Structures are given as C-alpha cells and as structure tokens.
UniProtKB/Swiss-Prot annotation:
Example of a GO MF term: nickel cation binding
Cleavable signal peptide: none
Reported function: Required for maturation of urease via the functional incorporation of the urease nickel metallocenter.
Organism: Pseudomonas fluorescens (strain ATCC BAA-477 / NRRL B-23932 / Pf-5)
Primary location: cytoplasm
The keyword Phosphoprotein is annotated on this UniProt entry: no
Record's subcellular location: Cytoplasm
Name this polypeptide is given: Urease accessory protein UreD
Length: 279
C-alpha cells in the first residue's frame, strides 16, 4: 500500500529483535534457539543441500524500515554446525524525520560455518539509515558474508539527495581484528560522484570470505564478465571483494558468480542458490 508522504513520515516505529543459534546434532545442523521480539521472524528452516547445512530466511513483515525503527539481529553458530541466512527480498529504508538503526551480531565457533547472504538494501533519499555489524570468529571458523547497498532508487531515477547512510563493520578472529570499516555518506555528498568515492554509481557491494585462494582462482574471479566495476584483494586469511554498479541486480549477480567459484574452493561445497532468490 502506498501511503501519503505525511502519513509515511509519522508511521509508529518498530523495535524488533531476533536471536538465533545453531548446533551440530550428529550429521545435522539444527536451530536450537529462535527468539523474536516484534516483527522480525525467520521462516521454517530448510535443508536444500542435505542435513549438514541449515538454511533460514529472515523476514521483516512491515516490509521496510522507517525513522525510529530499531532492529537487532544476533546469530550464533556452534562448533561443527553450518548455517546459511538470507532474505526474501530487498530491505527498504524509507525517508524519515529521524534515524533508524540495525545492529547485527554474528558469532561463529571453531569448526563452524556461517553464510550471510541477504538480498540488497535500498536506502531511499531522505532516509537516515545506521547499520552496525560485528562478527566474531573463533579458531578455524569459516565465514562467507556480503552486503549490497543501493543509495536512492536508481530504477526510478531517484538520487540520494537527502538524509544519510552510515555503516560500521567489524570482523574479528579470536579477538584480533581482520577487517574494520566505517562509512558515512550524506545525501548530496560529493563522494557520490567523486572518482575517489562512488564515482556516480548508486550501488556498492562488499564480500568478505575467510581463507586464501591461489593466483589461478583469483584471476578467474577477476575475469568474470559483468557490467560492474569490481576487484578482489587477498589479505592474510581473508579475501575481500568490492564493486560499484548502476543497479543492485548487477552487483548481486556478480556476488553470486563469485560465490559459485569460491564456495567449492574455500568451503568445500558446490554453490546451490536458495530458491527464494528466484521468486
């Protein structure tokens, strides 16, 4: 339903929490904790790849995030378990008179694997979006994490002219930092068009994968034919991929192709895209 502008700006805020935990029981990864407060939910867990990988789809029923909304998501993957978390569609941050926030805390135990593969986040012009992500890995825990951000609504010709987008991302292994990132982009900011910023591209994406790959696979990743401006960097114990794109679908397609190449090499399993991505 489309609300008049005045109504949309003053819709009551949501405070929502979702807490998840996964454990290995024999040969099966099972959800052992699923607690929610407010409109955040997960759908029934799936085993599309067999019992070892537990897939959950996180949904936010109101359909979007507005001023005053506060979302908190935490997920813990215990030793030997494998969880894959995704979303049914784009997360939308609407224009608002005050900030909205999302806090994400992910913990992965030794021998465990977490894939965090949400669909894109669309930040409308005049939204005030503030995202904080903290990921803690222990021992040989494995991670495949991505995020896709679209500022404004490129498909509708809307530029990000007002409001702000802020994101903090921290990744640790055994308490030692692997990756720290701080972003803050204001509506109409010069960084949106600067060659040292987004260079006129409204969409940017980040991929973090634990592990290291050989030069041959790195070149195969770099040679992917896609209409994005992307590259990869191999750091000690961490592979980082970044891209700029004119559309979120382009960035997502690039990340999925990287996932198809990297998942067998770094996680030991062929990539099988969740069915929800095709709906």
């Amino acid at each position: 339903m489309n609300l008049p502008a005045a109504t949309a700006l003053f819709t009551p805020s949501w405070h929502a929490e979702l807490e998840l935990a996964y454990a290995r029981c024999g040969a099966t990864t099972r959800p052992v904790l699923r607690r929610h407060l407010g409109p955040l939910r997960v759908q029934k867990h799936l085993y599309a790849e067999g019992p070892e990988v537990c897939q959950h789809i996180i949904v936010h029923p109101p359909g979007g995030i507005a001023g005053g909304d506060r979302l908190a998501i935490s997920a813990r993957v215990d030793s030997g378990a494998w969880a894959q978390l995704t979303s049914p569609g784009a997360a939308k941050w609407y224009r608002a008179t005050g900030p909205a926030s999302q806090t994400l805390n992910l913990q992965v135990a030794p021998g465990a694997t977490l894939e965090w593969l949400p669909q894109e986040t669309i930040v409308f012009s005049a939204a005030q979006a503030e995202l904080t992500t903290r990921i803690e890995l222990q021992g040989d825990a494995r991670l495949f994490y991505w995020d896709i951000i679209a500022l404004g609504r490129p498909a509708s010709g809307e530029r990000f002219e007002q409001g702000h987008f802020q994101a903090h991302l921290d990744l640790y292994r055994d308490g030692r930092p692997l990756w720290h990132e701080r972003q803050r982009i204001g509506g109409g900011d010069g960084l949106l068009d600067s060659p040292i910023g987004l260079d006129g591209q409204p969409v940017f994406a980040t991929l973090l994968v634990t592990g290291e790959i050989d030069s041959e696979l790195l070149e195969r990743c770099r040679a992917l034919a896609h209409p994005v401006r992307g590259d990869l960097s191999q750091l000690p114990g961490l592979l980082v991929a970044r891209c700029l794109a004119s559309e979120a679908l382009q960035a997502r397609a690039w990340l999925i192709e990287l996932w198809r190449l990297l998942r067998p090499a770094l996680l030991g399993r062929e990539a099988r895209p969740p069915r929800i991505w095709n709906t």
